[in-house]
Amino acid sequence: VKSLIEYSNDLNVMVIPDMDFPSHSKAFLSLIKQNDKSLYQEIISDYSDNTLDFFSNRKAVDVTNRQIDEITELFKQPQFAEQQRIVLGGDEVAGGGAHQNSFIEYMNQIGDYAFQQGYEPQMWNDMVTHEGVKSLNNHYSILYWKQNEDNKSNLTVEDFDKYYFDVYNYNYYSLYFLPSKQFSQDDINEQAEYIGWAYAYNKFYYNKNPYNEVNSQNVKGSALSFWGEHATDMTQEELINQEVPLIKAYFNLKK
């Protein structure tokens, strides 16, 4: 990671660390379980073994903040002081919708801590309800991957704008790709062509239209995401051969 940061500094490129709390944390929690079973039992959620307990659990918050502290220090880039961002997660949280107050309280606590380290915290959109957004700390910016189908949490980009949240487009269709050995070069070329017509920085995934154009001042950018769950058996060369054509397609169109 240090070599990556040094290389990025030479190119004047800001690196955004991406973590995921309180859910999608099974690997992190497994390490804690191996080293301190007592602590593990105190911070594990009753809902899922990949989720930290977000119900006013001070120890769970402290453990999260220690991880944030380690990552923010590791990724620090002085030339981007007060501009750096960190993704803290907040997506697909078991119980997060039904217990929105506790979920938002947890996200506010860890977001405040990241902000104190000089980073802008970011979180995914899907677990925030129409009530929850009212108390979510504005330190956060929102990564919008798709509109939730639940009426309680189907906020649009415009809804987030009403509460002064900046939003980044992570469209679940046009800006997602999962590299895999099953894809041929023709498949990659087809995906690159798809990005060419489907992507625009303001085309968001809404339930009735995955390419819904949004004209709102709070749209601050977009990102192309690669997810690695199908790529564990791929070499670095194979990964690069699939990803680079899509990256080129994305940047050629980015405004």
Predicted ranges, named:
Residues 12-16, 51, 83-87, 120-122, ...:
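Structural preference for beta-strand elements that scaffold enzyme active sites
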Residues 19-25, 92-94, 127-129, 146-148, ...:
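Active-site-proximal loop/turn and secondary-structure-junction residues that shape catalytic pockets
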Residues 33-34, 66-73, 127-129, 151-156, ...:
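Alpha-helical scaffolding within the catalytic cores
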Residues 107-109, 131-135:
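N-terminal active-site wall of soluble small-molecule enzyme domains
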Residues 133-255:
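Flexible, acidic glycine-rich loops studded with aromatic residues
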